[in-house]
Curated annotation (Swiss-Prot):
<feature type="topological domain" description="Periplasmic">
    <location>
        <begin position="28"/>
        <end position="355"/>
    </location>
</feature>
<comment type="similarity">
    <text>Belongs to the peptidase S1C family.</text>
</comment>
<dbReference type="InterPro" id="IPR011783">
    <property type="entry name" value="Pept_S1C_DegS"/>
</dbReference>
<dbReference type="GO" id="GO:0008236">
    <property type="term" value="F:serine-type peptidase activity"/>
</dbReference>
<dbReference type="GO" id="GO:0005886">
    <property type="term" value="C:plasma membrane"/>
</dbReference>
<feature type="binding site">
    <location>
        <begin position="259"/>
        <end position="264"/>
    </location>
    <ligand>
        <name>substrate</name>
    </ligand>
</feature>
<keyword id="KW-1133">Transmembrane helix</keyword>
<dbReference type="InterPro" id="IPR009003">
    <property type="entry name" value="Peptidase_S1_PA"/>
</dbReference>
<protein>
    <recommendedName>
        <fullName>Serine endoprotease DegS</fullName>
        <ecNumber>3.4.21.107</ecNumber>
    </recommendedName>
</protein>
<keyword id="KW-0645">Protease</keyword>
<keyword id="KW-0378">Hydrolase</keyword>
<dbReference type="GO" id="GO:0042802">
    <property type="term" value="F:identical protein binding"/>
</dbReference>
<keyword id="KW-1003">Cell membrane</keyword>
<feature type="transmembrane region" description="Helical">
    <location>
        <begin position="5"/>
        <end position="27"/>
    </location>
</feature>
<feature type="binding site">
    <location>
        <position position="184"/>
    </location>
    <ligand>
        <name>substrate</name>
    </ligand>
</feature>
<dbReference type="InterPro" id="IPR001478">
    <property type="entry name" value="PDZ"/>
</dbReference>
<dbReference type="InterPro" id="IPR043504">
    <property type="entry name" value="Peptidase_S1_PA_chymotrypsin"/>
</dbReference>
Length: 355
């Protein structure tokens, strides 16, 4: 019995020695040990580079007005943010930030303060362009004209909420192409869950590279049931903002073409009467009296097939197309009415002025 026990112990020792030689990792195995690492070697996830690229170009904007109850002293009425677009000193902000201002003050992040000149503003997009005359260089926002914002892109909202000083909030692009959020229904917004608070209006919405994606413009204050929703903010896409800026710099206002209809797009359908051609277009549901469309003979329930030789697929895109046509131009508009195709000549007018 004792001999068998010794034999078993000896075999166990031999097997153990073989395993230690074959698998050296077993020698230091300690099930109670905690993995050690040096945190100084790790790089934390950060958007600091994007902030350093974009933030210097985002300014504080102060709307000052005369207070007749205080011996006509200038006082701050509203505050917001703005974005320096180029070295000439042009700044984009929201129109509602500078409405009725007697004086506009712009404060840069480097401590410089300027009185700004209002170049022009546009009610339909709620955009305004300011200009400052600065000696020395100005920080400008990075713009990549080829960059297309996508749902899920990380974005940073930069502005001056509640006059706390420059603040950065982070989120994603929640949706693109949001329309119908302003009275004109013509606006095309980016939606984001990055916080956009009072004072952020006119500030920059940038991507993770610090490139301008949009101009922060508004957030939902109340929902239909009276609750204050969180994570719903909007920005004007940078492509539209830069286009409006160029027009304001050139003309001092935005000159838009106007056709004078309201409508909705329809999906392709087969023409009545067994025709094989598929129709797609905009059904006219409103014609402004004495407007260009009415004067050309366009009627309610007409189906617009093309405008100025371009297919009419989206009501918003077609209105944007018309807006780019200079007033006074005569364009062909093809409509279907009672199974007949008509080509009508429409003289474009200037879009009626709004406050």
């Amino acid at each position: 019995m004792f001999v068998k026990l010794l034999r078993s112990v000896a075999i166990g020792l031999i097997v153990g020695a073989i395993l230690l030689v074959a698998m050296p990792s077993l020698r230091s195995l300690n099930p109670l040990s905690t993995p050690q690492f040096d945190s100084t070697d790790e790089t934390p996830a950060s958007y600091n580079l994007a902030v350093r690229r974009a933030a210097p170009a985002v300014v504080n904007v102060y709307n000052r007005g005369l207070n007749t109850n205080s011996h006509n002293q200038l006082e701050i009425r509203t505050l917001g943010s703005g974005v320096i677009m180029d070295q000439r000193g042009y700044i984009i902000t929201n129109k509602h930030v500078i409405n009725d201002a007697d004086q506009i003050i712009v404060a840069l992040q480097d401590g410089r303060v300027f009185e700004a000149l209002l170049v022009g503003s546009d009610s339909l997009t709620d955009l305004a362009v300011l200009k400052i005359n600065a000696t020395g260089g100005l920080p400008t926002i990075p713009i990549n004209a080829r960059r297309v914002p996508h749902i899920g892109d990380v974005v940073l909202a930069i502005g001056n909420p509640y006059n706390l000083g420059q603040t950065i909030t982070q989120g994603i692009i929640s949706a693109t192409g949001r329309i119908g959020l302003n009275p004109t229904g013509r606006q095309n917004f980016l939606q984001t869950d990055a916080s956009i608070n009072h004072g952020n209006s006119g500030g920059a919405l940038v991507n993770s590279l610090g490139e301008l994606m949009g101009i922060n413009t508004l957030s939902f204050d109340k929902s239909n049931d009276g609750e204050t929703p969180e994570g719903i903010g909007f920005a004007i896409p940078f492509q539209l903002a830069t286009k409006i800026m160029d027009k304001l710099i050139r003309d001092g206002r935005v000159i838009r073409g106007y056709i004078g209809i309201g409508g909705r797009e329809i999906a392709p359908l087969h023409a009545q009467g067994g025709g094989i051609d598929q129709l797609q277009g905009i059904v006219v549901n409103e014609v402004s009296p004495d407007g260009p469309a009415a004067n050309a003979g366009i009627q309610v329930n007409d189906l617009i097939i093309s405008v100025d030789n371009k297919p009419a697929i989206s009501a918003l895109e077609t209105m944007d197309q018309v807006a780019e046509i200079r007033p006074g131009s005569v364009i062909p508009v093809v409509v279907m009415r009672d199974d007949k195709q008509l080509t009508l000549q429409v003289t474009i007018q200037e879009y009626p002025a709004t406050n």
